[in-house]
Amino acid sequence: MKIGVLGVQGDVREHVEALHKLGVETLIVKLPEHLDMVDGLILPGGESTTMIRILKEMNMDEKLVEKINDGLPVFATCAGVILLAKRINNYKQEKLGVLDVTVERNAYGRQVESFETFIEIPAIGKDPFRAIFIRAPRIVETGRSVEILAYHEGDPVLVKEGKILASTFHPELTDDLRLHRYFLEMVK
């Protein structure tokens, strides 16, 4: 199994390190043809407007949508969720539009208002998961086929739709590998 990490901007290194700790071969995806070389893909946190602009400049956006629609498993964190969302409230931004959610960018505040909390994620076990929110998006609406795996103060923060796993927080910034392991099970 080989997992790609989109390498255009953001928390690339942190995801690669998490995957290496799990003994997984990785590829930093920087070219459209790299998408044909991976069994699953992680879209890291970062700055979503920069990421979509770079994807378009590299002509990778259409290929990525095609691969996801063909069943490529994807794990998106923070800005990656914004990239995948079908709808973004109160902000005009291009997106890939493959995940049936509506999001609000930076909904939990600015960088200085970032926070950590523990959340319950029954799908990965009974122990709470340390969730780090940094200028995180808020999922304000989910489509019928979207399964909500975790909440924070009533808002969905971890969702799954088909082969897409989407987290508004940053699991790659913790030592807890359970979400990465959960994603690898989706890829198998």
Curated annotation (Swiss-Prot):
It holds the Pfam family SNO. It catalyses: aldehydo-D-ribose 5-phosphate + D-glyceraldehyde 3-phosphate + L-glutamine = pyridoxal 5'-phosphate + L-glutamate + phosphate + 3 H2O + H(+); L-glutamine + H2O = L-glutamate + NH4(+). GO terms for molecular function: glutaminase activity; pyridoxal 5'-phosphate synthase (glutamine hydrolysing) activity. It comes from the Bacteria. The keyword Ion transport does not apply. GO terms for biological process: glutamine catabolic process; pyridoxal phosphate biosynthetic process; pyridoxine metabolic process. Keywords: Glutamine amidotransferase, Hydrolase, Lyase, Pyridoxal phosphate. The active site is at C78 (nucleophile), H170 (charge relay system), E172 (charge relay system). L-glutamine binds at G46, E47, S48, R105, I134, R135. Its EC number is 4.3.3.6, 3.5.1.2. InterPro entries: Class_I_gatase-like (IPR029062), PdxT/SNO (IPR002161), PdxT/SNO_CS (IPR021196). One of its GO terms (cellular component) is glutaminase complex. Pathway: Cofactor biosynthesis; pyridoxal 5'-phosphate biosynthesis. Belongs to the glutaminase PdxT/SNO family. In the presence of PdxS, forms a dodecamer of heterodimers. Only shows activity in the heterodimer. Catalyzes the hydrolysis of glutamine to glutamate and ammonia as part of the biosynthesis of pyridoxal 5'-phosphate. The resulting ammonia molecule is channeled to the active site of PdxS. This is Pyridoxal 5'-phosphate synthase subunit PdxT. It comes from Thermotoga neapolitana (strain ATCC 49049 / DSM 4359 / NBRC 107923 / NS-E).
